[in-house]
Amino acid sequence: MTRCKHDVPEAPAPSADPDAWWEPISAEAPAGPWLEYDTAYAALGARMVPPVEVQYGDFRQRRDAPAWPELERECRDLLRRSRDITLLVWWLRCRVHACGADGLEQGLRVMQRVLRALGAHVHP
């Protein structure tokens, strides 16, 4: 995987490396389980929402911007368990925030390889 100047060094866990994501998780379930109702998946999805300003009368509050390196680690953790197009898009967004155009290129390349290798097995 291409690293960029904003990447935080970490020891990759098994299958946390995007270069392994196009390999089946198991013979019985190549894409692993669908995590749609998994609490970690739902929490990650809620944190991927861009910050918005909320105003009620004189009260104003702006939610903090997402912590992209932390969100990327969470995407990788979930992608170890499941091949899900939504997770891949979230991971791609994290890579764009970390590396700009290089992150976009890397993310699209990984998504293409996953979809070619696992096709219809990838969860929506």
Question: What function would you assign to each model-found segment?
Answer:
Residues M1-P124:
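N-terminal domain-start signal
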